[in-house]
Swiss-Prot record:
Family listed: Belongs to the major facilitator superfamily. Sugar transporter (TC 2.A.1.1) family.
InterPro entries the record matches: MFS_dom (IPR020846), MFS_sugar_transport-like (IPR005828), MFS_Sugar_Transporters (IPR050360), MFS_trans_sf (IPR036259), Sugar/inositol_transpt (IPR003663), Sugar_transporter_CS (IPR005829)
Protein name: Major facilitator superfamily transporter mfsA
Protein source organism: Aspergillus fumigatus (strain ATCC MYA-4609 / CBS 101355 / FGSC A1100 / Af293)
GO molecular function: carbohydrate:proton symporter activity
Length: 542
């Protein structure tokens, strides 16, 4: 079992775990930005002539090349989907760090295949195979890293860390855009091979971190390895394995694990329509990932440089610069989410995001209806406004919301379904965007604008506010809505924050299974978010 900490403990160990996680998510964003810059690179299309758009293409030629471009780009998402599925079925058995090491290793193999593919015979096929293999590795990592980091971190900073991981996706995109721009003057295939190969550096850092850092205490407890769990907890906290602090956290994890086991479910449990509303809550959790993709984020990220050049008719050099500026704005715009996610709340941020993104794309499509130089500038403004709103709203929210909205017994299934929804919708959007943009440069933005407004309506009626709520309170909200015949968001608005005693009382009145002995032990151990934070802050000061 991997309990090694490489001599690190306390703050240094926690920072090392965070660093490895951050690099892993940066790699996710790096690939998005890399392909955005490569697709219109001279040497890239010379190496893969099938991707080169002729000067005066016929409608058939343009359609064919758009299909190939979409397939070459979106095949990565298909690999990610299967990697996430593998993690869902094998993750608990293999462990967090083992799975991350496997994912990083597979990603390295895929990056090598893509980097060294030779031209002249089936070159696109080689490139696609490499991207699919890389995607499998990335899918394994993106499904596992947040769990590993969350289980190794304190209760009070988990929401912040999810936002930080989202910011690092944008950070990876930022790095990729400027790397591609910086090497765009190279006169041979190094112009595209170097950015592709640079993925290997990120993956090596992640793989090294997985080898040198411990698995999560929660995973050890789930496998019955209590001594190892206490050993790792002691290292993370910077104290001895038998200290009061370690025993407190160990008992907390043990209690939560027993609660989860007592609520074990299968897929049949998901299709529950009574007071607990499992199926409705599963769909709501998945809807965030659906709307994240179908409101246009990856259409803008993957194809921004191409859109600047082909749809907005900018010169190639200027389109590369605009792509870099676009990525810089994207990265910087994630910063407000760190402060707003708790203060503003999930529901309001969702609505702000849908409205802002929709209006941004309205500006873009309206400016593209009649193509002029001035209108192109207005269209570019719309794209920049879109990515600004997206960065602090729909980038982090779909990753935070599913674990909060789903009940305990379907939380694992709900999180897995949400992740798979993301990758499948990602694949679909990245595949059809170049086809749609080729047929109607303004129509594609109208399409995404309409989906944003659909999301605004859906979010208003179906998203309840979970910020500051205990997970048991969300169960009460849906049960009260079912009993009283009200919309859950109205119940959540009218229901004040409940104390532990009020949660138990209302759960009994509503006929919910409260698992009293588990809840009492949670209270004793300080498992609620507020008390856990207070306890951890006390220990941090010692």
């Amino acid at each position: 079992m991997w309990t090694t900490t490489s001599g690190l403990s306390g703050r240094s160990l926690r920072l090392s775990i965070t660093f490895a996680a951050v690099v892993g998510f940066s790699l996710f964003g790096y690939n998005q930005g890399m392909m955005a810059g490569l697709l219109n690179g001279d040497e890239f299309v010379n190496s893969f002539p099938i991707l080169k758009m002729p000067d005066n293409p016929t409608a058939g030629e343009k359609h064919y090349i758009d299909v190939i471009r979409g397939a070459v780009t979106s095949c990565y998402e298909l690999g990610c989907f299967f990697g996430a599925l593998f993690s869902m079925f094998c993750g608990n058995r293999l462990g967090r760090t083992r799975l991350i090491f496997m994912g990083a290793s597979i990603l390295i193999v895929g990056a090598l295949l893509t980097t060294v593919c030779y031209t002249g015979k089936w070159e696109v096929g080689q490139f696609v195979i490499g991207r699919v293999v890389s995607g499998i590795g990335n899918g394994m990592n993106t499904a596992t890293i947040p769990v590993w980091q969350s289980e190794c971190s304190g209760a009070h900073n988990r929401g912040f860390l999810v936002c930080f991981e989202g910011a690092m996706i944008a950070g990876g995109t930022f790095i990729a855009y400027w790397v591609v721009f910086g090497i765009s003057h190279a006169a041979d295939s190094v112009q595209w091979r170097f950015p592709v190969a640079l993925q290997i550096f990120f993956a090596l850092v992640v793989a090294t971190g997985a080898l040198m850092l411990p698995d999560s205490p929660s995973w050890f407890v789930s496998r019955g390895l209590d001594n190892e769990a206490c050993e790792v907890l002691g290292k993370i906290k910077g104290t001895s394995p038998d200290s009061d602090q370690v025993l407190h956290d160990f008992n907390l994890i043990k209690t939560d694990m027993e609660s989860t086991k007592s609520e074990q479910s299968n897929w049949k449990t998901v299709f529950t329509f009574g007071k607990t509303q499992e199926f409705q809550r599963l769909l709501i959790g998945c809807s965030g990932q659906f709307f994240q993709q179908f409101t246009g984020c990856n259409a803008a990220i993957y194809y921004s440089t191409l859109l600047f050049q082909e749809n907005l008719h900018m010169e190639k050099y200027l389109s590369l610069i605009m792509g870099g500026v676009f990525a810089s704005v994207y990265a910087l715009a994630t910063i407000p989410s760190f402060f707003m996610i708790e203060r503003v709340g999930r529901r309001k941020l969702y609505l702000i995001g849908f409205l802002g993104q929709g209006l941004s794309f309205v500006i873009t499509f309206a400016c593209l209806i009649k193509e002029t130089e001035e209108n192109s500038k207005g269209a570019a403004v719309g794209i920049f406004l879109f990515i600004t709103f997206f960065a602090f709203t729909l980038l982090p929210l779909p990753w935070i919301y599913p674990p909060e909205i789903n009940p305990l017994r379907t939380r694992t299934v709900g999180a897995s379904a949400s992740t798979c929804t993301n990758w499948m919708c990602n694949f679909a959007v990245v595949m059809f965007t170049p086809l749609f943009a080729g047929q109607s440069p303004w129509g594609v933005y109208l399409f995404f604008a309409l989906f944003n407004f659909v999301g605004l309506i859906f979010g208003y009626f179906f998203y309840v506010e979970t910020a500051g709520r205990e997970l048991e309170e969300v169960d009460i909200i849906y049960a009260k809505a079912h009993v009283e015949g009200k919309m859950p968001f109205r119940v959540a608005h009218d229901l004040p924050k409940l104390s532990f005693e009020e949660i138990v009382q209302q759960s009994r009145e509503l006929g919910l299974d409260t698992n009293d002995h588990v809840m009492l032990e949670k209270k004793e151990l300080g498992l609620s978010s507020d008390s856990a934070q207070e306890t951890e802050e006390v220990y941090e000061k010692q």
